Amino acid sequence: MSYLLPHLHSGWAVDQSILAEEERLVVIRFGHDWDETCMQMDEVLASVAETIKNFAVIYLVDITEVPDFNTMYELYDPSTVMFFFRNKHIMIDLGTGNNNKINWALKDKQEFIDIIETVYRGARKGRGLVIAPKDYSTKYRY
């Protein structure tokens, strides 16, 4: 499904996509196109792209092809989704302790749309940290 979404092939392209967008949230999935977790996330991203196009834009970045941000954003997971608004990284508190990114595959489309809407509303108000609509601290039931 990753072929349905725009890929960024250089660090410069990533920077320009973040800088160029003034009114919409920039959602970037960093990862490997061949990874199973990425494929699951890409499927959700592709399915919501049309719904959220008025307030968010989605890009994909292969961290092997574009390693520029791996250290800066600690991109060690197979799939990582990050949010940017007006050239600023927007953090999201998901209850997991890591407020910088979503590093697992969300399987529910509406759940992801809710997260994007929440991040967008918070970013428009000038917030750098947004509280997620759902607590993911117990996403794994032990």
From Swiss-Prot:
Q: Which SUPFAM superfamilies match?
A: Thioredoxin-like
Q: Which GO terms describe its biological process?
A: mRNA splicing, via spliceosome
Bridged cysteine pairs (disulfide): none
Please indicate which superkingdom the organism of origin belongs to. Answer: Eukaryota
Q: Which CDD domains match?
A: DIM1 (cd02954)
Q: Which Pfam families match?
A: DIM1
Q: Name one GO cellular component term.
A: nucleus
Tissue specificity as recorded in UniProt:
Expressed in roots, leaves, stems, cauline leaves and flowers.
Which family, according to the similarity comment?
Belongs to the DIM1 family.
Question: What is this protein identified as?
Answer: Thioredoxin-like protein YLS8
Q: Which organism is it from?
A: Arabidopsis thaliana (Mouse-ear cress)
